[in-house]
């Protein structure tokens, strides 16, 4: 099993997004969401990764970044690490600066994306956001983004995952 920046449970995800949108008011809505989840998914609504990993005998490789603003590290990785850090089936890889969407990208990509983002912000300011269109965004990307640099994978992580799976089938 390879997990990349994943939530422990669907209710954790709902609560986290709800807290971003509604603040502490989500606490009053959570019982409703729990009931909706149970009505829609039955017994599956209460499943979570932590308990599933505990029952599994599979080897597990878990990636997460401390600065993930979509899925806070304490809602998954930290829980798994606390429970399984001493279990030889588990391998943990924690990053500090890869966010949620860039776990697989090299450090060069992160730097390049920051540069492109700064250029894009400047481009938007020059045009004026009121007049900005989707076509302009597409044109900017075509003219200014080197897709090979923008999407380059971290070869060490890819190698680590392949080796992990190779070791599992031996």
Predicted regions and their residues:
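Hydrolase active-site cap/lid region
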Residues: 1-42
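Hydrophobic/aromatic beta-strand patches that form the interior of the parallel beta-sheet core
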Residues: 2, 61-63, 93
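Active-site nucleophile elbow and catalytic-triad environment of alpha/beta-hydrolase enzymes
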Residues: 35-52, 58
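Short, conserved loop/helix-junction motifs that constitute active-site signature segments
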Residues: 54-56, 85-86
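Short beta-strand/loop motif that positions the catalytic acidic residue
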Residues: 55-57, 62-68
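Short alpha-helix in the alpha/beta-hydrolase fold that links the catalytic acid
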Residues: 58, 72-83, 107-108
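Acidic catalytic loop of the alpha/beta-hydrolase fold
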Residues: 66-71, 99-102
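C-terminal catalytic histidine-bearing segment of alpha/beta-hydrolase fold enzymes
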Residues: 81, 86-170
């Amino acid at each position: 099993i390879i997990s990349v920046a994943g939530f422990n449970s669907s209710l954790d995800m709902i609560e986290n997004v709800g807290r971003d949108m509604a603040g502490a008011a989500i606490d009053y809505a959570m019982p409703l969401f729990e009931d909706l989840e149970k009505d829609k998914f039955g017994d599956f609504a209460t499943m979570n990764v932590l308990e599933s990993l505990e029952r599994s005998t599979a080897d597990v490789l878990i990636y997460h970044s401390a600065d993930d603003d979509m899925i806070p590290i304490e809602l998954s990785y930290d829980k798994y690490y606390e429970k399984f850090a001493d279990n030889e089936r588990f391998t943990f890889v924690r990053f500090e600066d890869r966010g949620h969407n860039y776990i697989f990208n090299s450090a060069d990509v992160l730097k390049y994306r920051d540069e492109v983002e700064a250029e894009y912000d400047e481009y938007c300011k020059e045009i004026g956001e009121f007049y900005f269109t989707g076509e302009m965004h597409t044109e900017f990307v075509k003219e200014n983004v080197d897709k090979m640099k923008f999407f380059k994978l971290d070869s060490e992580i890819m190698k680590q995952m392949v080796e992990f799976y190779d070791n599992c089938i031996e």
